[in-house]
Amino acid sequence: WANGAKYTGHWKNDKKNGKGIMNWDDGCKYEGDWKDDVRHGKGVFEYTNGDKYDGDWADDIQHGRGTYYFHTGDRYEGSYLLGERTGEGVYYHANGDKYVGNFKNGMQDGKGTFTWANGAVYEGSWKNNKRDGRGVYKWSNGDVYDGDWKDNRPNGQGTLKTVAGMQYKGGFVDGLEDGQGVQIDKDGNRFEGFFKQGKKNGPFVETDKDGKVIKKGTYKFGRLQ
C-alpha cells in the first residue's frame, strides 16, 4: 500500500471482504471482519498509544456493542453509535471509580449511577458528564442529599440529612443552603427561615419538637441581630 499499510486476509471482487488483518506503518492494527474494503462486523483495533477497541464495526467506525481499553487503565463496556459512546454502558476508572448508565456522544448523559472508590455514590440525572437534574448523593460518611443538581452541585430544592441527625430541607445554590429552608436538629428543634451562601440570613422562627416557639428574630449573614 502507498501509505505503508499491509493487509493479510480474504478478498472478494478485488476488495477486502471477510476476515483479515491490517497493519499500518504508524503501529495501528486491525484484526477482524471486512466488507467492501471497510471494517464491518466484529473486530479489534489497537492504537499506537496502547488503547484498544474490541467490538462491533459498521462502515469503518465503531458502532454497536464494544469494549474500549484505555492505556491509562480505564475501561468502557457498552454501546457505540457512529464512533461515540452512546446508549447504555459501564465505565471503569483505573482508580476504582465506576459509572453505570447512559452515555451520549462519549459523555455521561441521562440516568446513571457513579460509585467512587471511597464509597460515595450518586444516582440520578447527568448532562455532559456533570450531575444535572434530580439525583441522590450519599457521602462515604453516610450523609445524604436528595434533590436538584446543576453543574455537579446541589442547585434548586433538596433535602440534606446528616448521620449526626441534622436535616435541612429547602433551597440550595452551588452546594450551599440558600433561600427559604427548614432545619431540624437531632432533638427535633425546628428552625424555619432564610439562608444565604450556607449562613442563616433573614427573619426566622425556632420551635421545639412540640411546636412551642423558642425564639424569633432576624439573622444577618450568620449573626443574630
PLM features per residue range, with description:
Residues W1-Q225:
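Glycine/tyrosine- and acidic-biased, solvent-exposed loop/turn segments at the edges of beta-strands
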